[in-house]
Amino acid sequence: MFILEAELPSAITAFAEKFSDILRRRKVLFGSDPFVGVKILRKILIARLDQVLLNLILRLREVYVMRGLREEQLAIAIADAAGPLRSCAATLLELEGQKENSPKAALEKYVKSTGESAWLEALPRISEAREQRILPPGVAGAVLLNLIDVAKSIGSRLEKLREAEC
């Protein structure tokens, strides 16, 4: 990302979930940290997280419908969705006052908290899809549907958080 310092306030508001992830994981290699003191308004972060989740759900559903018979393409979609889904889980946990060392750990913690065994079984497949860009025959469709369900579940928990704040 190549962004001017003057553009930061607008960009942070427009892409609150993305910048939340940047704030969590940034490492300054040279010079001063342009994000020192940056705070994202909670209500903006909640609204943007809701948008990101809805977009992810819609995109994954479209992939499933349009390319569901092509498992190699589903595996790529799973790999591509892993980062945003993990980041969404990390943001939700952060909004709930919990911290995790990585977005991957945040997603695992979230899934464990739901008690959904199918989702827990899907987690290693997500990593496998990211690393190998392919999954064993007959697996990708179920994993992708599980990702949609996880994203919907994160959205439901986010909605409860929003309601609790009103």
PLM ranges: what are they?
Residues 1-2, 32, 85-88:
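Short acidic (Asp/Glu) and glycine-rich catalytic loops that position anionic groups and cofactors
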Residues 1-30, 37:
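Conserved catalytic core of two-metal-ion nucleotidyltransferases
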Residues 17, 24-31, 55-62, 66:
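Alpha-helix capping at helix-to-loop junctions
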Residues 39-166:
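Conserved nucleotidyltransferase catalytic core and NTase-mimicking acidic/glycine-rich helix/loop elements
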